[in-house]
C-alpha cells in the first residue's frame, strides 16, 4: 500500500467517524448527504477496500487478527463501561443499560450491542467482525466465479435485505442476518472498487458529479425530515433494521454518500494530508466510536452544573440528549472530537 493511498484511506476513516459523531449530534457537514444516510455503509466500504485476498487461504490467521483488533478491545471497553454505568447509577440514580449478567455481557454484543447506553455505538464493531468473517468465507466459496456473477450475488444480498426485513419478524438473530446481508454488499463494493476501478478509471469527472447530484436530488423526494422525530434527513437505522417505508432508497443513498466521500477526499487530499489532527482522528476511529457518547455525557454534566441544574435532569432524556442544542451543538462536537482523539 503506497503512502498516498494509505493517507487517503486514513482521511476517509476520519471523515467517516466525524460523520458518526455529527450524526449523533443531529447536524450534517454535507447538507445534501446527511450522515445517517450512508456513514456506516462508508465504514463497511472502507473495510472492503482494506481486505487482503491472501487471507482466503489462511482463515485461522484472519480470524485471529480480527479477534485481536476488534473483539479484544471491544470487551475491554465493555468491562470499563460496565463499571462506569454502575458508578453513574450510584451517583445519579439512573442505570444506563441492560441488566448486568453474562448473557448481556457476552451474547448481546453480537445481537444488538446496546447492553450499555454509553458505549452503544460500538455495536458496529461486533457487526463488522461478523460481516468480515462472513465475507471471507463467501469469497472462498465464490473464488471460481466470474466478477459479474459475484457482483450479482452481492448486489442481490444488499438490495433484498430491506424487503426481507419487512416480510419476516425481526428476531434478534434475523436482525443480525439482515444487517450482515446489507453490509456485505458494501464490503464487496469497497473490494471491487480497489480491484477494478481505483487506478483504472476516473469516476470523479464533472459529468459523474452532476449525475450523482441529480440522483441525490431525486432521492430527497423520499426524505422524511419534516418532523424532528425523523432525525436529519434520508436516515435509516441499520442496527435495528429501521428503514421505515423505504425499499431501495437506503442502498442508493449509501452509494451516493460513499461516492461523494471519495470525491471529497480526492479534492481535499493535498490540503488535509498535512493536518496532524486529521491524521490522528483517522488513526483513532475505534476509540472515538467507543467514547464519544460518554464524553458528551460529561460535557452535559458540566454544563448542567454551571447552570445550577441538577444532574437528575439528564436522567429524563435519552443517551443522545445534549443541553440547549441550538447554542451548544458545535461546542459539543469540537470538544468531543478533541477529547476522544
Where are these regions (language model features)?
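Alpha-helical transmembrane segments and their immediate juxtamembrane cytosolic regions
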Residues: 1-341
Amino acid at each position: 500500500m503506497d503512502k498516498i493511498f494509505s493517507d487517503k484511506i486514513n482521511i476517509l476513516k476520519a471523515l467517516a467517524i466525524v460523520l458518526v459523531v455529527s450524526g449523533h449530534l443531529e447536524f450534517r457537514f454535507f447538507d445534501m448527504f446527511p450522515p445517517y444516510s450512508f456513514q456506516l455503509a462508508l465504514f463497511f466500504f472502507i473495510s472492503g477496500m482494506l481486505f487482503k485476498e491472501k487471507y482466503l487461504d489462511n482463515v485461522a490467521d484472519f480470524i485471529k487478527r480480527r479477534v485481536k483488533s476488534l473483539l479484544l478491545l471491544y470487551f475491554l471497553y465493555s468491562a470499563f463501561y460496565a463499571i462506569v454505568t454502575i458508578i453513574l447509577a450510584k451517583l445519579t440514580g439512573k442505570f444506563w443499560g441492560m441488566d448486568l449478567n453474562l448473557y448481556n455481557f457476552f451474547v448481546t454484543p453480537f445481537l444488538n450491542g446496546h447492553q450499555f447506553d454509553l458505549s452503544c455505538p460500538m455495536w458496529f464493531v461486533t457487526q463488522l467482525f461478523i460481516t468480515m468473517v462472513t465475507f471471507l468465507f463467501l469469497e472462498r466459496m465464490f473464488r471460481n466465479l466470474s466478477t459479474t456473477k459475484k457482483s450479482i450475488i452481492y448486489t442481490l444480498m444488499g438490495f433484498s435485505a430491506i424487503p426481507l426485513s419487512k416480510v419476516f419478524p425481526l428476531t434478534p438473530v434475523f436482525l443480525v442476518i439482515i444487517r450482515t446481508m446489507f453490509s456485505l454488499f458494501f464490503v464487496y463494493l469497497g473490494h471491487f472498487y480497489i480491484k477494478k476501478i481505483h487506478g483504472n478509471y476516473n469516476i470523479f469527472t464533472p459529468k459523474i458529479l452532476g449525475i450523482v447530484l441529480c440522483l441525490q436530488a431525486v432521492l430527497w423526494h423520499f426524505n422524511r425530515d419534516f418532523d424532528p422525530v425523523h432525525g436529519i434527513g434520508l436516515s435509516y437505522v441499520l442496527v435495528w433494521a429501521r428503514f421505515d417505508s423505504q425499499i431501495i432508497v437506503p442502498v442508493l443513498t449509501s452509494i451516493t454518500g460513499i461516492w461523494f466521500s471519495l470525491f471529497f477526499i480526492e479534492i481535499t487530499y493535498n490540503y488535509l494530508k498535512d493536518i496532524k489532527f486529521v491524521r490522528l482522528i483517522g488513526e483513532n476511529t475505534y476509540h472515538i466510536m467507543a467514547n464519544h457518547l460518554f464524553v458528551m455525557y460529561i460535557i452535559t454534566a458540566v454544563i448542567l452544573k454551571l447552570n445550577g441544574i441538577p444532574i437528575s435532569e439528564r436522567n429524563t432524556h435519552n443517551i443522545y440528549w445534549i443541553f440547549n442544542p441550538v447554542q451548544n451543538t458545535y461546542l459539543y462536537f469540537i470538544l468531543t472530537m478533541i477529547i476522544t482523539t
